[in-house]
């Protein structure tokens, strides 16, 4: 592999050290290596902000692992940044000097504002949805809050609170008591209060979280079959569960890994304070953060205004998809959606996911015609899809699995991006659009009227169409039968 196309970003965080190695390919990045080690550097800071020898040794040990991988990458294509703990430590110089010797490249201690800016860039390059956003990143010793529109930040704040420092301060007795949570939340709200007005002034349409705490919440919710949106009610529910467990070493929540458990209660308390103080309705997980911001900064790639469209284009190119046919199916599905939207009340994000499924529905053909829907579902489940959340990927895979043949109703109910009923409705529209665009020519798509009354669909074709299209009639009869097996009434006239 040509080493000039390789880039590395290393983030010396207060809780974990991370390394990301990517390859630039056709204007996008392909992840080759991700290494993360829990170093808990912030736990080695004493009251005088002196970093202990043990904490420094843990850090250097980790960097020796990273150094081996960096040998293959040109130095101008490596960026190493250090954040909150090394901003605070009075003896940071000692740690950094040895770190630079181990890695063989400069280590830059960045300001809180620069960290916030890079986090925002990482989110802007990798996360779909509305472009007016609030980004929250809870680190080990600092929390970054950024508002912005598109690629541009409108306000940036880095606050002195993090999941490691809050663990040492409010849960040092390892006791998960209500009082400990109350104290941790109260002080976190006090820290937030001075910046809350400016954040609210700039406003946001979506809120995304870009930290281990948010990642852990996402894993818990996926494991428990909840939808992926983080809300205050869900956070309070998890707090009560933690309090019931009593002690940190006994903390057991389905979906919470042992590795994340130690700093989970402290991160949870900070997140509850942020939700409460800023009146956040819901939050989803970001696709990337600081390390992605560093990489995209080195590559000088512009932020694509529509990340999901870029992702779909890249995948269509890679799997040699007939884009004319994909657009034909999408146009027809959108037409059907408009005809039933008053009856079915389908939200804009559900529409976007349906159209994404249309764009990808034929990728399975690149493997084999036989079982193409299975291949398509497998590919979507396992491909990196910037702009789509894990739950949205699961929904897309489920729709592609059910694009034709008998319907697997349980799979539509197991995804958690949209309610089961909505998944069923999207599936029905996708199947009909694929069926009626099957001749692969715009002039052969009939004029179709679609009406919905609850779950009953009535499909009206031009008067003599069925008589002149015996194969088409057979396919429609078969589809009608398949839909009836899962109690989806389809009346064709």
UniProtKB/Swiss-Prot annotation:
Pathway: Purine metabolism; ppGpp biosynthesis; ppGpp from GTP: step 2/2. It holds the Pfam family Ppx-GppA_III. This is Guanosine-5'-triphosphate,3'-diphosphate pyrophosphatase. Belongs to the GppA/Ppx family. GppA subfamily. The lineage of its organism: Bacteria, Pseudomonadati, Pseudomonadota, Gammaproteobacteria, Enterobacterales. GO terms for molecular function: guanosine-5'-triphosphate,3'-diphosphate diphosphatase activity. Disulfide bonds: none annotated. It comes from the Bacteria. It catalyses: guanosine 3'-diphosphate 5'-triphosphate + H2O = guanosine 3',5'-bis(diphosphate) + phosphate + H(+). NCBIfam families: PRK11031.1. Its EC number is 3.6.1.40.
């Amino acid at each position: 592999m040509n080493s000039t196309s390789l880039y590395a970003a290393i983030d010396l965080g207060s809780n974990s050290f991370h390394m990301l190695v990517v390859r630039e390919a056709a204007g996008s990045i392909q992840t080759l290596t991700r290494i993360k080690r829990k170093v808990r550097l912030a736990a080695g800071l004493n009251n005088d902000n002196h970093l202990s020898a043990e904490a420094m040794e843990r850090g250097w040990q980790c960097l020796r692992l990273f150094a081996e991988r960096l040998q293959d990458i040109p130095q101008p294509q490596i960026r190493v940044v250090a954040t909150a703990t090394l901003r605070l430590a009075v003896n940071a110089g000692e740690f950094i000097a040895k770190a630079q010797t181990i890695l063989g490249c400069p280590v830059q201690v960045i300001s809180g504002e620069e960290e916030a800016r890079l986090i925002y860039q990482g989110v802007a390059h990798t996360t779909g949805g509305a472009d007016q956003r609030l980004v929250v990143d809870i680190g080990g010793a600092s929390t970054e809050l950024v508002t912005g529109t598109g690629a541009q930040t409108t306000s940036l704040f880095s606050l002195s609170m993090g999941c490691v420092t809050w663990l040492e301060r409010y849960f040092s007795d390892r006791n998960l008591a209500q009082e400990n949570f109350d104290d941790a939340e109260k002080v976190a709200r006090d820290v937030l209060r001075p910046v809350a007005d400016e954040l609210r002034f700039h406003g946001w349409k979506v809120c995304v979280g870009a930290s281990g705490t948010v990642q852990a919440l996402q894993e818990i919710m996926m494991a428990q079959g909840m939808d992926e949106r983080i809300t205050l009610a869900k956070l309070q529910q998890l707090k009560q569960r933690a309090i019931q467990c009593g002690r940190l070493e006994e903390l057991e929540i389905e979906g919470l890994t042992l590795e994340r458990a130690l700093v989970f209660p402290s991160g949870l308390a900070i997140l509850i304070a942020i939700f409460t103080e800023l009146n956040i309705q819901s939050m989803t997980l970001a696709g990337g953060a600081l390390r992605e911001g560093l990489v995209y900064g080195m590559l000088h790639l512009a932020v694509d205004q529509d990340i999901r469209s870029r992702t779909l284009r890249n995948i269509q190119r890679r799997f040699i998809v007939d884009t004319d046919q994909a657009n034909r199916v999408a146009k027809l599905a959108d037409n059907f959606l408009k005809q039933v939207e008053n009856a079915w009340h389908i939200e804009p994000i559900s529409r976007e996911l349906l159209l994404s499924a249309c764009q990808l529905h034929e990728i399975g053909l690149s493997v084999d015609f036989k079982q193409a829907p299975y291949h398509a579902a497998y590919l979507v489940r396992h491909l990196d899809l910037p702009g789509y959340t894990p739950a949205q990927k699961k929904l897309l895979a489920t729709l592609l699995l059910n694009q034709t043949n008998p319907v697997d109703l349980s799979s539509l109910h197991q995804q958690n991006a949209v309610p089961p009923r909505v998944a069923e409705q999207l599936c029905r529209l996708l199947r009909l659009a694929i069926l009626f665009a099957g001749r692969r020519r715009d002039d052969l798509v009939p004029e179709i009227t679609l009406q919905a009354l609850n779950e009953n669909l009535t499909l009206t074709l031009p008067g003599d169409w069925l008589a002149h299209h015996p194969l088409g009639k057979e396919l429609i009869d078969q589809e009608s039968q398949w839909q009836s097996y899962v109690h989806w009434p389809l009346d064709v006239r």
